[in-house]
């Protein structure tokens, strides 16, 4: 029998009566609307499907204060994580958000109305208080605290919601169970005791052994329940992770384990988050929940210390186990014993026994360099999946971003690089020359600071997409402003796959650029015929963070090209 929902009743708000659903959709089209953020969408989905039972909407101020102060809602139910809908003053005024107002909540991906909220109150946020109460700190090294201070708006809207529709998904649809559906699935396959395993990382042999041990100890089945909403910045993308989980499932004895995806926006809140995760799994019908070492920990604070103790999460969940009605299965870190070819919890290893481990950092290094990943650590199918998504350096894309004055030699260097990289082979090469981009992508833009910024953003977007696809990108705009170049670096390193970005300052002196200007553009600018010309009546802010500085007045194109090739070789990219 599945576990009872938290609070006694599963708050499944999905409307199954077609006429009522149609009426709500019709009403939503007439209401003021809030387009949700990614986190708000994740939260709303788990509100309307019952994953956050007993919540029936976003927290009002009374529930919010109770959650912060003693982890309890006004009705006395335990709930350790604030679930809030943040808005700013402009939205409050423009949408007339006040008690009794009805607001449509829309999916940012397709603009569909997901729910209608009936506002009970609007209240100001004390972000320092929230950070300290929930995360035990106000240190911006914590990703959720950074999000709170930099992304969350200054007011919260409380109120119950009515579901209009479910968020649409096109990936892994068969694995996306609501709490009611997963409970039905457990009943169908006659699972009475279920151990849930929460993860935001790929799984390897240690994780398989840990979950099998947990099932054996509790005479239960295993639910692999990974988070596929928002996780920690820098985590492996959920597409890759789900392929890993799918490849791992046949490694379990037939009928022991099943896989379901959880659209949760994690907060990396350590002990409170572990308690929250247990409540969510209870709502999904689970009877046991694995809490491991440093569960949902965010890593180090700004002083280099862990935000939470390694077993603080286990301690807090244990305190409330009886009230929750879900049994925690505590586990320490698993370690490999070469002599017996098995994994054991570190606290069960006999002193003096040789053990072996591979850290997350070391695994990433091996993936990056193509170094071997041993069978004792992971399975061949898992490693193959990870290598497909995270190829070694020699197969990764990169962007060479050349910046310098007009006629500084950027174009000659860029074209020579294109030839050398094509000669090298192994990846496609794309050339984004300043004049070409201006003609093909930015023909409507002028040369004002704002237009220059937009032009660089467009170049950066294209370069990032090409880099992510494994190409070698050579971009050669003037890019005179530090802000624009920082934007380019940020966009390409964050969205360009491995984020291999190199800023090359073509520092040819203005006098040389002007003296060798066969087109006479500098002369026209001096005569006032061209306005906003870099180096004449517009500034060029010299880079202070260039990866390489070259000068065509002192070096030949061949020498400069060779120095750039050596830079790439030093990074194992060629």
UniProtKB/Swiss-Prot annotation:
Complex and partners: Homohexamer. Dimer of trimers.
Ranges for region N-terminal: 1-170
Functional summary from the UniProt entry: Catalyzes the first intracellular reaction of sulfate assimilation, forming adenosine-5'-phosphosulfate (APS) from inorganic sulfate and ATP. Plays an important role in sulfate activation as a component of the biosynthesis pathway of sulfur-containing amino acids.
Subcellular location: Cytoplasm
Pfam family, one: APS_kinase
Binding annotation for ATP: 198-201, 292-295, 334
Top enzyme category: transferase
Active site positions, chain numbering: 199, 200, 201
An annotated Gene Ontology molecular function: ATP binding
Annotated protein name in UniProt: Sulfate adenylyltransferase
Sequence segments annotated as region (Catalytic): 171-395
Gene: MET3
């Amino acid at each position: 029998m599945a576990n009872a929902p938290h609070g006694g009743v599963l708050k499944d708000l999905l409307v199954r009566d077609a006429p009522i659903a149609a009426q709500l959709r019709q009403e939503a089209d007439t209401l003021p609307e809030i387009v949700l953020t990614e986190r708000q969408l994740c939260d709303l989905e788990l509100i309307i499907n019952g994953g956050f039972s007993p919540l029936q909407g976003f927290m009002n101020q009374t529930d919010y204060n109770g959650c912060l102060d003693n982890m309890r809602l006004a009705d006395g139910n335990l709930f350790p994580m604030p679930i809030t809908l943040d808005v700013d003053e402009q939205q409050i005024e423009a949408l007339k958000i006040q008690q009794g107002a009805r607001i449509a909540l829309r999916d940012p991906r397709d603009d569909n109305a997901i729910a209608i909220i009936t506002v009970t109150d609007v209240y100001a946020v004390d972000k320092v208080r929230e950070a300290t109460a929930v995360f035990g700190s106000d240190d911006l090294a914590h990703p959720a605290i950074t999000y709170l201070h930099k992304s969350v708006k200054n007011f919260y809207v409380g109120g119950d919601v009515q579901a209009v529709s479910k968020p649409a998904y096109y990936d892994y649809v068969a694995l996306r169970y609501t709490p009611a559906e997963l409970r039905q699935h457990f009943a169908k396959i006659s699972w009475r005791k279920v151990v849930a395993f929460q993860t935001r990382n790929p799984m390897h042999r240690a994780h398989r052994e840990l979950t099998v041990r947990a099932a054996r100890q509790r005479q239960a089945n295993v639910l692999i329940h990974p988070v596929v909403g928002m996780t920690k910045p820098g985590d492996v993308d959920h597409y890759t992770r789900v392929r890993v989980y799918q490849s791992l499932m046949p490694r379990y004895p037939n009928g022991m384990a099943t896989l379901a995806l959880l659209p949760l926006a994690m907060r990396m809140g350590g002990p409170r988050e572990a308690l929250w995760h247990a409540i969510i799994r209870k709502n999904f019908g689970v009877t046991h929940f694995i809490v491991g070492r440093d569960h949902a920990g965010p890593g180090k604070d700004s002083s280099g210390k862990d935000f939470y103790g390694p077993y603080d999460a286990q301690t807090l969940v244990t305190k409330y186990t009886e009230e929750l009605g879900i049994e925690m299965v505590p586990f320490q870190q698993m370690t490999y014993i070469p002599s017996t070819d098995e994994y054991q919890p570190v606290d069960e290893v006999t002193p003096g026994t040789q053990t072996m481990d591979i850290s997350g950092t070391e695994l990433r290094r091996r993936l990056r360099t193509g170094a071997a990943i041993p069978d004792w650590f992971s399975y061949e199918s898992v490693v193959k999946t990870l290598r497909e998504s995270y190829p070694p350096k020699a197969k990764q894309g990169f962007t060479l971003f050349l910046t310098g004055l007009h006629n500084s030699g950027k174009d000659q260097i860029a074209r020579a690089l294109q030839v050398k990289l094509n000669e090298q082979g192994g990846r496609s090469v794309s050339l984004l020359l300043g004049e070409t981009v201006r003609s093909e992508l930015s023909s409507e833009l002028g040369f004002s600071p704002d237009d220059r910024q937009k032009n660089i953003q467009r170049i950066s977007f294209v370069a990032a997409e090409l880099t992510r696809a494994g190409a070698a990108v050579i971009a050669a705009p003037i890019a005179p402003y530090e802000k624009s170049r920082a934007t380019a670096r940020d966009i390409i390193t964050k969205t360009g796959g491995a984020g291999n970005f190199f800023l090359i300052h073509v520092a040819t002196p203005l006098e040389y650029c002007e003296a060798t200007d066969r087109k006479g553009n500098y002369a026209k600018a001096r005569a006032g015929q061209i306005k906003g010309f870099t180096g004449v009546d517009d500034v060029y802010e010299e880079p202070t963070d260039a990866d390489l500085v070259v000068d065509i007045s002192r070096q030949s194109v061949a020498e400069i090209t060779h120095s750039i090739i050596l830079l790439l070789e030093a990074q194992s990219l060629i």
